[in-house]
Swiss-Prot record:
GO biological process: 'de novo' IMP biosynthetic process; adenine biosynthetic process
Presence of the UniProt keyword NADP in the record: no
Subcellular localization, as worded in the UniProt entry: Cytoplasm
Organism of provenance: Magnetococcus marinus (strain ATCC BAA-1437 / JCM 17883 / MC-1)
Family: Belongs to the AIR synthase family.
InterPro entries: PurM-like_C_dom, PurM-like_C_sf, PurM-like_N, PurM-like_N_sf, PurM_cligase
TM stretches of this protein: none
Main location (coarse class): cytoplasm
Pathway linked to the protein: Purine metabolism; IMP biosynthesis via de novo pathway; 5-amino-1-(5-phospho-D-ribosyl)imidazole from N(2)-formyl-N(1)-(5-phospho-D-ribosyl)glycinamide: step 2/2
Gene transcribed to yield this protein: purM
One Gene Ontology molecular-function label: ATP binding
Protein's name in the database: Phosphoribosylformylglycinamidine cyclo-ligase
Any GO CC annotation of this UniProt entry: cytosol
Amino acid sequence: MAHNQDASSPSGMTYRDAGVDIDAGNRLVSMIKRSVASTHRPEVRSDLGGFGALFDLDTRKYQDPVLVSATDGVGTKLKLAFLTGKHDTVGIDLVAMSVNDLVVQGAEPLFFLDYFACGKLSPETAATVVEGIATGCRAAGCALIGGETAEMPGFYTEGEYDLAGFAVGAVDKHKIIDGRHISPGDAIIGLASSGPHSNGYSLIRKLVLGQSGPGLEADFNGKPLGEVLLTPTHIYVLPLLELAKTHAIHGLVHITGGGFWENIPRILPDATGALLKRSCWQQPEVFNLLQKLGNIAEDEMLRTFNCGLGMLVIVPATQADSALAQLRAAGEQAELVGEITSCKEGDARVVIL
């Protein structure tokens, strides 16, 4: 049967009648081509719009390469984007959550794919989100090589969408960072976060938007609180990859859901613990506000939020000073915040004084 693109002769129901606008999807692809191209790496072997994306791994850069993958979303932080109409930062969050998980294993992020799902596609909104994704990819040095836009009428509330991201990286097998070399006496360096990142937003929304909450328009140091809470997740990739070339990184901890109590033990070998000193880093004011709004106990704060530290770097004590200097020179706010300790069975693995 011949395909006739003349839509002027109605002959029955169309996909658009069901709520799916293929033309809007095509407009979106045209709108994002420049942003996607800005993330290009020489290993990319395909253009946007194919059935799949091709990436030619340059094995000459590795002795024994291992691929590392990660996937994540932005969670209910998206609700703040819907309420404020500010969609330019959540794409950065999407990339950050996955690439930060790659670098903690020593992997260089190579490429990224996204999934954007909505009830009715707004090409303008989606393009703004993808521009943020491209910004995140450039910050991490990875290519945005593909994605999926799913328009599903009746499935999502009008004006809302969901995001998922998928990242793949590579690391030489002998350079994998998995915590096996962590030992008592190692130094723990904390890298400052840009805010709550992408965790704890169900609680944040309850505190800020609840009956007695200040609301998103409330002034916070000269900015609307909603804008402050949408500050994108910090991407630590490039400074840490450079640090790994010059220092023996024994472990890296991405402080995400579960906070300090849940994430630090994931990297600790048996018979070791972590001692952190709260006085060694400053908790940003936004966390002080949240703690005050909910009268949140300190233990719960440390379980829910990063409290100002988005990444922990564990190095031999003899390398702590030079690691601090290099990280600061790279633009990171880095502080010596603790040390690795010996730990007996039954002892607390993480102690924060």
